[in-house]
């Protein structure tokens, strides 16, 4: 059913550059340069979309997405002077400039004769008096949240020049019960915490779920029947299979960028080394060969290199090697130990967990190890995962005490840290690519 809904959505969601919705070719004055570091959020007015409760819900989700990014400051609707009733009419720009709304979003949601929703919006530069963007979409009513996320992505991209990340999903480990008898299941949700549902229902420990590049399957580790194994799970059908029936423990799986291989750590003869498995031929290739623990591999976005953690030097550090295992080079040299590295989708940074001074931090560094920056520090922060635009990270935090872990997001400035709502405790998040 999920596959049918998505295919139907893909077929019927139509972006129209026409019918009066074409954006002005003039250069907009409203821009956000997110490469400058910590920027002042842009004041933006997002009106209630016209016609019905669902229309208002869509505009509310758009506002929430943009606000959570830290780059936009939606203006309180109580300050609006003009009450928009006709989205096709030119706004009264003076009314919006008075409240310092530098950008304005108006829209309309209507129901077609065949039951589909038609959602349309316009983005205006109020000080230049020009339309920056106009689009419309057709979809089924149950997909209204996706439409809201897609519109938020379009606004984000038009103003920042960067791809958005709102139309994405998070797979994670949902945790419940007391700390000494915690139950763990795989779960999936929208990036803002909505539409959460369980993917597994056993009492076996599950860890490190990771999306495939095509978003249709995940790989994860499970201790089913007390045997740690790496599995592939098809999201649409719920079918799963073991990735190789190895005699030792397998863990920390992750897909290659082309989705043709899984890279993982395999323990044999007391040592844990990095292996890849071709998902078609089921052949394995050993990439590291040490007496240490090599684990948590992550490919560069072009698939040419791999970052991983190893204690071959005495404590956990980060190393980079070629995708064939060649040129293994240590890149972390700061105080403390480093773990859970993951390469940015942009290729410019590697995120990691750092343990130092009794605390755990989430940070980033360049692939050569330079430019290390700590974004957040706490009692126990771990497991960073990148948004598909490479501008935001999600991780999990465990505070001292009897409580459980929670998910947080943080941007690369380190200033915009947000709690991600989940149903109960949550750990080990993994961010999907943009949906299609």
From Swiss-Prot:
According to the UniProt entry, the coiled-coil residues are: none
Which subcellular locations apply to this protein?
Periplasm
According to the record, the signal peptide region is: 1-28
Similarity comment: family membership: Belongs to the TolB family.
**Annotated function:** Part of the Tol-Pal system, which plays a role in outer membrane invagination during cell division and is important for maintaining outer membrane integrity.
Q: Which organism is it from?
A: Sinorhizobium medicae (strain WSM419)
The identity of this protein, by name, is Tol-Pal system protein TolB
* GO BP, one annotated term: cell division
């Amino acid at each position: 059913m999920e596959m049918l809904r998505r295919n139907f959505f893909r077929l019927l969601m139509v972006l129209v550059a026409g019918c009066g919705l074409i954006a002005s070719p003039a250069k907009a004055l409203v821009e956000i340069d997110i490469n400058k570091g910590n920027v002042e959020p842009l004041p933006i007015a997002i009106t209630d979309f016209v016609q019905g409760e669902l229309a208002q819900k869509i505009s509310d989700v758009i506002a929430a997405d943009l606000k959570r990014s830290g780059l936009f400051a939606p203006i309180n609707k109580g300050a609006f002077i003009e009450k928009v009733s006709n989205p096709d009419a030119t706004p009264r720009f003076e009314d919006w400039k008075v409240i310092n709304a530098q950008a304005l979003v108006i829209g309309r949601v209507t129901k077609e004769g065949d039951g589909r929703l038609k959602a349309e919006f316009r983005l205006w530069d109020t000080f230049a008096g020009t339309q920056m963007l106009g689009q419309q979409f057709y979809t089924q009513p149950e997909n209204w949240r996706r439409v809201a996320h897609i519109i938020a992505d379009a606004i984000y991209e038009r103003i920042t020049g960067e791809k958005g990340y709102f139309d994405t999903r998070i797979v994670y480990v949902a945790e419940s019960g007391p700390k000494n008898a915690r139950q763990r299941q795989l779960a999936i949700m929208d990036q803002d915490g909505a539409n959460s549902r369980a993917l597994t229902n056993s009492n076996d420990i599950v860890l490190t779920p990771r999306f495939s590049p095509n978003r249709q399957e995940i790989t994860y580790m499970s201790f089913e029947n007390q045997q740690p194994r790496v599995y592939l799970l098809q999201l649409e059908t719920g079918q799963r299979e073991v990735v190789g029936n190895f005699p030792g423990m397998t863990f920390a799986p992750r897909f290659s960028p082309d989705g043709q291989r899984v890279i993982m750590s395999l323990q044999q003869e007391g040592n844990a080394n990095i292996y890849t498995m071709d998902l078609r031929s089921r052949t394995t290739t050993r990439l590291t060969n040490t007496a240490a623990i090599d684990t948590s591999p992550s490919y560069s976005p072009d698939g040419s290199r791999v970052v991983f953690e190893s204690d071959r030097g005495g404590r956990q550090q980060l190393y980079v090697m070629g995708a064939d295992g060649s040129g293994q080079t240590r890149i972390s040299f700061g105080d403390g130990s480093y773990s859970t590295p993951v390469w940015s989708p942009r290729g410019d940074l590697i995120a990691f967990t750092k343990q130092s001074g009794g605390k755990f931090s989430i940070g980033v560094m360049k692939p050569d190890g330079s430019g290390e920056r700590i974004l957040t520090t706490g009692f126990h922060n771990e497991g960073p995962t990148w948004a598909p635009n490479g501008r935001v990270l999600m991780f999990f935090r465990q505070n001292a005490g009897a409580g459980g872990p929670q998910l947080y997001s943080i941007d690369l400035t380190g200033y915009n840290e947000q709690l991600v709502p989940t149903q109960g405790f949550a750990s080990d998040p993994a961010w999907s690519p943009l949906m299609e």
